[in-house]
Amino acid sequence: MYVIQINKATKTYNNGTIAVHPTSLNFEPGTFNAILGPSGAGKSTLLRMINGLEIPTTGEIIIQGQTLTAKNLRQVRSRTAMVFQQFNLVGRLNVMTNILTGRLYYIPWWSSILYMFGQRDWKIAQWALNRVSLKEKAWERVDRLSGGQQQRVGVARALAQRPEVILADEPVASLDPIASEEIMELLREICRQDGITIVANLHQVSLALRYADRVIGLNKGRVVFDDSPQALSNNKNTLRTIYQREDGSVDDTLEMAVTD
């Protein structure tokens, strides 16, 4: 069974903008999938549809055999964790409390308001903290951490959900090159060792080629490439197809990719 199935899904906004044209994609369990494309290609919208943050205009999203609907949104979201470019952490709270918010799907609403977590939640959060090698930072305020450390907290929060899928929306775009490599290594390790499917929007082509099992190229809301990193690296014309603008010029990302 595929862990994610996208069946002819589209997204059109009220102003008539088509963010995603009819798209069908399947994702295997335990694979690392990178999505490339210029700004405005529909990458973030696609991830948000998978997580239920955006509702497809037409088509359907299926997670672990269950079609995403308004009625089962909370249940399905609990199995698809998000990692964000800007971390989406509460800076004034400590690391452990931020990680515990990954357990909010599993506790009553009144407990979530009071940040009342059970023993199992604490054990899972501690495991997630150790998994990202931040044990010594457990009680430190998040806003005192480096960018790379904050993203590790973001990954730990995602792990605390015990998800089948982690959706990473530009997870290293705000980080320096060394921290970027460390986060990508961590995500690949989680994919390999924990069997969690990773779907990551990336700006850096070189990282997609180095870490992904599969690369999907989007341009103007359409899938224009879907193959292995090796197939992409062997064909620079395909890179131009992915990053070509409407006026025929190419996105700056392509120039960086060619010189990587």
From Swiss-Prot:
What Enzyme Commission number does this protein have?
A: 7.3.2.2
Q: Which InterPro entries match?
A: AAA+_ATPase, ABC_transporter-like_ATP-bd, ABC_transporter-like_CS, ABC_transpr_PhnC, MetN_ABC_transporter-like, P-loop_NTPase
Residues in ABC transporter domain copies:
4-245
The UniProt GO MF terms for this protein read:
ABC-type phosphonate transporter activity; ATP binding; ATP hydrolysis activity
Query: Record's Gene Ontology CC terms?
Result: plasma membrane
What domain of life does the UniProt record list for this protein's source?
Bacteria
As for membrane topology, the entry says: Peripheral membrane protein
Annotated catalysed reactions: phosphonate(out) + ATP + H2O = phosphonate(in) + ADP + phosphate + H(+)
The compartments listed are: Cell inner membrane
Q: Where along this sequence does the record place binding of ATP? A: G37, P38, S39, G40, A41, G42, K43, S44
Q: Which UniProt keywords apply?
A: ATP-binding, Cell inner membrane, Cell membrane, Membrane, Nucleotide-binding, Phosphonate transport, Translocase, Transport
- What is the documented function of this protein? Part of the ABC transporter complex PhnCDE involved in phosphonates import. Responsible for energy coupling to the transport system.
Q: How does it assemble?
A: The complex is composed of two ATP-binding proteins (PhnC), two transmembrane proteins (PhnE) and a solute-binding protein (PhnD).
Family designation: Belongs to the ABC transporter superfamily. Phosphonates importer (TC 3.A.1.9.1) family.
This protein is called Phosphonates import ATP-binding protein PhnC 2
